[in-house]
Design a protein with these regions (language model features):
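Acidic, carboxylate-rich catalytic segments that either coordinate divalent cations
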Residues: 1-16, 20-23, 393-447
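Sequence-structural signature of the catalytic-core scaffold of metal-dependent phosphohydrolases
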Residues: 1-26, 38-49, 69, 73-74, ...
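Acidic, low-complexity proline/glycine-rich segments
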Residues: 32-44, 339-346
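A short small-residue
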Residues: 49-59, 232, 353-358
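Low-complexity, highly charged intrinsically disordered N-terminal segments
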Residues: 62-66, 70
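A residue-level signal for conserved active-site and pocket-lining positions in enzyme catalytic cores
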Residues: 163, 375, 427
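C-terminal subdomains that position terminal phosphate/3'-OH groups for nucleotidyl transfer/ligation
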Residues: 284-418, 430, 442
Length: 447
């Protein structure tokens, strides 16, 4: 892979190449991606989607939106720091093509901003609830009518693949969705493969999948345009990662490790003294002890340590990337950057504490149970009504259910897979609050 091709400004529907030197420097081409994402309704819905504590009304607990904004800030720093090194190593990128280190920052920031845009309501349990509706729930009956890969898309519903659809799906009059640049789409694609074969190797890029069967052709177009390296054979499609996808992943890893931990401390799920023991290992080289001692509140002390910890992890992630840049361009770096960080052991310790004390806390478990019930009931009602309408057997009740769908979802789907995936897509874009409201309306539940 080469950087000139990887930094593609091309957008869905373009006939030719967009040149960096022709871009308006007052609003860089890649900055347009960030703007389009942040103004999208799918991004706005993240303000009422949970990050750690489902349905939490506590002000300092992060939603998906605040988490995504923070990941984009970390991603921008990672991109600029790496971009500065890349431009210095390959000066022709600037001299001949006009690329700047800020382009790297803008790409990674935009992809990081969108990294959770396809995730269903109620945290990570939302993905599992959709998958289990098909694998062990009422959706099992559709298995024999789908191909193996279509079925896998449903039983292993993946927020990353759904996010690719959110960013790229066309609607009448809106060709190409948000029309994000190929470079930003490449950085967004942490798992550039289809759902089968499942985890064929230990390569980090094979851990999950990145596109549904409906998006396969366009995914291939984007990958080939940027020169991503194919790594599957026969009828299976997969590619090595776009190098900047490693930075998006690192930004997310850094934020959820440190900031989810911070949420747990502020909620009282992890004691401050216990947390300090682990955070200090990340900041021992940068902490100003005298300043730390002047901070009077727990929130200020933890905030100070969090900022230092994120700074330490950013610098180390950049170091790992730059040291392995040649291997990354060859598609021969099968690890997450933070897996090779000198702080990996410390991060693993913090993640273990978060799993034991935060992710498995009673409040989280209780709310995820509620989320399971809501999502699976909504899937059943809307899929049944949608299919009955298609075959001309819709009841008045089915018609009423379908009237609850926003106008943009009243699209005819000629095949069963398309209809099932369309309803999954609709459910996944609901906020926690809207999903709960739909559930209460359909079940006639009282507040």
């Amino acid at each position: 892979m080469n950087w000139e091709q990887l930094l593609s400004l091309k957008r869905q529907g373009d006939k030719g190449k967009r040149l960096r030197v022709e871009q308006d420097d007052t609003r860089l081409g890649f900055e347009v991606d960030y703007d389009r994402i942040i103004f999208s309704s799918a991004f706005r819905s993240l303000q009422d989607k949970t990050q750690v504590i489902p349905l939490s009304k506590t002000d300092f607990v992060h939603t998906r939106l605040t988490h995504s904004l923070e990941v984009s800030v970390v991603g921008r720093s990672l991109g600029r720091l790496v971009g500065k090194k890349i431009i210095a190593k390959y000066p022709y990128l600037k001299d001949a093509h006009g690329y700047h280190m800020n382009d790297f920052g803008a790409i990674v920031a935009a992809a990081s901003l969108a990294h959770d845009i396809g995730n269903p309501p109620f945290g990570h349990s939302g993905e599992k609830a959709i998958g289990e509706y098909f694998s062990i729930g009422n959706g099992q009956k559709y298995k024999d009518q789908l191909t193996a890969k279509e079925w896998q898309d449903l039983i292993d519903f993946e927020g990353n693949a759904n996010g690719f659809s959110v960013l790229t799906a066309s609607r009448p009059g809106i060709e190409g969705g948000l029309r994000i640049s190929y470079a930003t789409l490449g950085a967004f694609m942490k798992y550039p493969k289809e759902s089968l074969p499942k985890k064929p190797t230990k390569n980090i890029a094979d851990k999950k999948y990145g596109f549904f069967q409906t998006d396969k052709a366009f995914f291939e177009e984007v990958a080939q345009d940027m020169g991503l390296i194919p790594n599957k054979s026969g009828l299976d499609m997969g590619f090595e990662r776009h190098p900047l996808a490693y930075l998006v992943e690192a930004a997310d890893d850094i934020c959820y490790t440190i900031i989810d931990f911070e949420d747990g401390i502020n909620l009282g799920l992890v004691s401050e003294d216990f947390a300090l023991e682990y955070l200090i290992k990340l900041v021992k080289d940068s902490i100003d002890t005298s300043k730390y001692k002047t901070l009077e509140t727990k929130e200020d002390r933890i905030s100070y340590l969090r900022a230092l910890a994120i700074g330490s992890l950013i610098n180390d992630a950049v170091k790992v990337f730059v040291e392995n840049e040649a291997l990354i361009l060859q598609g021969k770096f099968p690890y997450a950057l933070m897996d090779k960080s000198k702080y990996k052991a410390q991060m693993d310790d913090i993640i273990k504490i978060s799993v034991d004390n935060i992710y498995q806390s009673r409040e989280v478990i209780e709310k995820e149970i509620v989320g399971y019930q809501i999502i699976q009931m909504l899937l059943d009602k809307f899929i049944t009504a949608f299919n009955n309408k298609y075959i001309g057997n819709a009841s008045n009740y089915d018609a009423l259910i379908l009237k609850m769908l926003p106008e943009k979802h009243h699209l005819e789907k000629e095949n069963l897979y398309g209809r099932l995936l369309h309803i999954c897509h609709f459910i996944s874009l609901l906020t926690d609050g809207n999903a709960l409201l739909f559930y209460k309306t359909i079940t006639a539940a009282k507040n």
